[in-house]
Each structure stands twice: as structure tokens, then as C-alpha cells.
């Protein structure tokens, strides 16, 4: 496929469009310090970024999963507006893509309420025709279902789309759904961690996407 045939761009949210890393780390630290005082360092918490809260907390203690998720989300919402920012060139890139008629969507493992908080805070909400959240699917990334659902809602074929994300779940989900994939070099887990999963492209900044899809 020639990448100039791409007319649809799907984005992960956290760590891709908006910088929620410090919010996520603080939310995990707050929750884990309550249930497991002193047991988890910042470096260990980095491994929890990407999978759903259910997967992370149920692996620790199935009986406490719901309580831990509730504590995490309460803290996360309280601190949200203090700790969330957008990444460099994101807004300008989205403006160009929208002006050129690209179909834009978000595919995330967050719940819808929290997604909308971040989009409204950063002014990104108007750019997206479709937002697929954890509430909308039976299977989260890296399963292809979330990407497939977004493509279906946008009326796009996989070969016309690229999935952009900061985590291996994003790359694997896009690959399984048949799209091109792009990793972001500003991933908190590091560029090398994404290269292991062979994304088609690696973005040093979001505006690099414009040349890839023929919108530069």
C-alpha cells in the first residue's frame, strides 16, 4: 500500500495526543500506596501504563479490583486538570488533517467520561468524528475489535487507515485489524520498546504524520 492512500487516522489518547503520564503515575501511586504501602516504585508503575485498570488490578488481587479501580478513578478525576497537557504539534497537525478531509478517530482503553475530560481540557474534542472507549467494546487493545469498531463507524477500510499510539497495545491492535501503524518516539516506555513490535512508522513529533499520509 502506498501511504498516500491513507484517508483515516486513528489515535490512542493517553501518551499519544495528551500527556497524562504524570497523572497516571500519580493515580497508581496513590492507589497502590493505600493497598500495598511501599511495595511499588515509580519504575515498576511504568509497566502498568497501557493495559486496562481491570487487567492491572485484577492480577494483583481479584477481590480488591473494583475498590482499587474506584480509588484510582476518584483520584485521577480530582487531579486531572492540574496534570494533563497536550503534546507539541498535536493541535496544528489535527487542524491540517481535518482541513484536508481526513477521517479522525480515537481508540482508547479509558472510559468515556475521562476521555471527554481530557479532550475538552486540551481543546481537541472537535476534531474527532468517532471515539471508541473501553465502554464500547468487549475486547480491549491489543485485540483488533476497538480499531475495527472505529473503522466501521467511520466507514473506512483497514488499508486506508493508520493507527497511531505510544504503547505496544496500539501497534498490535492496528496490525491485527489490518491497518498501517505508527509509534510515537515520546512514549514514556521508550522508542526502542515500540520498535520491537515493528510499527510501519515512527513519529519524532506528531507533525511527522503529515508527510506519511500525504498532507504536508
UniProtKB/Swiss-Prot annotation:
GO terms for biological process: DNA repair. Keywords: Hydrolase, Magnesium. It catalyses: diphosphate + H2O = 2 phosphate + H(+). Its cofactor is Mg(2+). InterPro entries: HAD-like_hydrolase_sf (IPR050155), HAD-like_sf (IPR036412), HAD-SF_hydro_IA (IPR006439), HAD_2 (IPR041492), HAD_sf (IPR023214), PGP-like_dom2 (IPR023198), Pyrophosphatase_Ppax (IPR023733). The keyword Hydrolase applies. Its EC number is 3.6.1.1. One of its GO terms (cellular component) is cytosol. The active site is at 12 (nucleophile). It is an enzyme of class 3 (hydrolase). Hydrolyzes pyrophosphate formed during P-Ser-HPr dephosphorylation by HPrK/P. Might play a role in controlling the intracellular pyrophosphate pool. This is Pyrophosphatase PpaX. It comes from Bacillus pumilus (strain SAFR-032). The gene is ppaX.
Amino acid at each position: 500500500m502506498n501511504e498516500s492512500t491513507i484517508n483515516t487516522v486513528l489515535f490512542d489518547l493517553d501518551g499519544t495526543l495528551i500527556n497524562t503520564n504524570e497523572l497516571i503515575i500519580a493515580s497508581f501511586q496513590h492507589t497502590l500506596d493505600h493497598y500495598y504501602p511501599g511495595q511499588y516504585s515509580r519504575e515498576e508503575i511504568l509497566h502498568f501504563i497501557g493495559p486496562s485498570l481491570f487487567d492491572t488490578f485484577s492480577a494483583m488481587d481479584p477481590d480488591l479490583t473494583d475498590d482499587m479501580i474506584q480509588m484510582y478513578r476518584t483520584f485521577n478525576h480530582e487531579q486531572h486538570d492540574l496534570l494533563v497537557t497536550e503534546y507539541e504539534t498535536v493541535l496544528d497537525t489535527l487542524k491540517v488533517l481535518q482541513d484536508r478531509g481526513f477521517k479522525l478517530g480515537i481508540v482508547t482503553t479509558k472510559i468515556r467520561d475521562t476521555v471527554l475530560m481530557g479532550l475538552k481540557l486540551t481543546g481537541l474534542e472537535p476534531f474527532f468524528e468517532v471515539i471508541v472507549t473501553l465502554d464500547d467494546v468487549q475486547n480491549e487493545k491489543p485485540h483488533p475489535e476497538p480499531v475495527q469498531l472505529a473503522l466501521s463507524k467511520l466507514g473506512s477500510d483497514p488499508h486506508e487507515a493508520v493507527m497511531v499510539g505510544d504503547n505496544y497495545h496500539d501497534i498490535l491492535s492496528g496490525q491485527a485489524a489490518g491497518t498501517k501503524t505508527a509509534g510515537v518516539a515520546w512514549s514514556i516506555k521508550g522508542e526502542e520498546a515500540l520498535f520491537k513490535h515493528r510499527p510501519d512508522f515512527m513519529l519524532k513529533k506528531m507533525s511527522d504524520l503529515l508527510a506519511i499520509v500525504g498532507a504536508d
